[in-house]
A protein has these predicted regions:
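Membrane/wall-proximal cationic-aromatic binding patches
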Residues: 37-159, 327-329
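Histidine-centered active-site loop/cap adjacent to the catalytic His
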Residues: 2-3, 7-10, 25-29, 334-363
Length: 363
């Protein structure tokens, strides 16, 4: 065989081997990641062979070969941010904390620090409040509403406190919370809500699986903990709230183990039917609305406009449309790519929707 023919033969052979290796690596990566494909940020940025090699090396030498595309860590300093709560499942301990978000850029780990201050009553700091406020603005919701990823002074609740210095803005929100938690909070604070006060209730379509503590929700917690807090030892005392309809179709609340490790059968169980989840969610909203005669401003942050839960609202509930589609500009920033929560631009966008609503409520 002549040299040119040999060169062509070996080139074709090498190409076939590379294609076979790429196909094999792709199959390997699919088998490893099939349970979390939907949660991945997008298409891979590197050949499957390199990704498979990195995955294999990370198994042999844990932590030595992190994937730059998916490497994210979060640390709360000091430890002890969360505490048990018999009704809510968990709550925040008072104190001043640093939320540290880490990621990889150009092969190096970098981090961003956010200051988080929790008041003695468990609310997040929103700024200087008058001792005798003319009215209170109660804000309830999840990690987006709480302001995961941003400093105390960057949350939309802080911006509202600055805009309305005569009011007292009280931020009752926390990561992982939903309307089930909001109902418990409303039962605790309802006697403090006076005529003229404002209640802001966060909502996103993903709240619904939290309401019923769906198995898919617990599996997402499992995967998130494994990727973001790999060094944290799971505690069997960690619990999440669950709303359900009892045998008489009445709303009931309880708590269940947060981690699949301690109830694997539940995590592997069937998902509740969508219409049941919607019914539970609607009952939660009705119960929250019944806690006060004051208007509740439902801050719709994410999800479809035709969400069944947003139909036939209680008389004292009014939607504040604040999804990304409700803005004429791109406002869905994040924490410099180190976290998916809304950054300062997102919080200002929420503030811009709520400010006129609160002004109108005062008139």
């Amino acid at each position: 065989m002549s040299r040119p023919k040999k060169a062509i033969f070996y080139a074709i052979l090498a190409a076939i081997v590379l294609v076979a290796l790429e196909i094999g690596a792709s199959a390997f990566l699919y088998a490893v990641n099939k349970d979390r494909i939907a949660a991945l940020p997008g298409a891979p940025s590197e050949p499957a062979i390199l990704l498979a090699l990195r995955t294999g090396l990370s198994w042999l030498l844990p932590g030595s070969f992190p994937d730059p595309a998916s490497y994210r860590r979060m640390t709360r300093l000091p430890a002890g941010f969360f505490a048990e709560d018999a009704e809510q499942g968990y709550r925040a301990n008072p104190g001043r904390y640093i939320f540290r978000y880490s990621g990889m850029r150009q092969g190096k780990v970098e981090h961003l620090d956010a200051v988080v201050t929790i008041n003695p009553d468990g609310t997040r700091l929103t700024g200087k409040m008058p001792a005798d406020a003319a009215r209170r603005i109660f804000v309830l919701g999840d990690s987006y509403v709480f302001g995961d990823g941003v400093n105390d002074q960057q949350t939309f609740a802080f911006l509202l406190q600055t805009e309305f210095p005569g009011a007292s803005v009280q931020l009752h929100a926390l990561a992982g919370y939903s309307w089930a938690n909001a109902l418990v909070t409303m039962q605790r604070i309802k006697d403090r809500i006076r005529p003229g006060d404002v209640v802001i209730l966060g909502y996103a379509q993903y709240y619904k699986e939290r309401h019923v503590a769906a198995p898919a929700r617990l599996r997402s917690i499992r995967d998130w903990m494994a990727s973001t807090f790999p060094e944290v030892e799971l505690d069997p005392k960690d619990r999440v709230i669950r709303a359900r309809l009892d045998t008489s179709n009445r709303l009931a609340l309880d708590t269940i183990p947060m981690h699949c490790k301690f109830d694997p059968a539940y995590c592997a169980g069937p998902e509740p039917a969508p219409d049941y989840v919607d019914r539970v969610s609607s009952e939660l909203l009705r119960a929250i609305a019944a806690s006060t005669p004051e208007k509740i401003h439902l801050l719709h942050m994410f999800g479809a406009k035709n969400d069944p839960v947003l139909r036939n609202l209680p008389a004292n509930v009014e939607i504040v449309a604040a999804t990304p589609q409700d803005f004429s500009y791109v406002m869905q920033d994040n924490i410099m790519g180190l976290d998916d929560h809304g950054g300062p631009y997102w919080h200002y966008a929420m503030y811009s929707k709520l400010r006129p609503v609160i002004i109108a409520a005062r008139q």
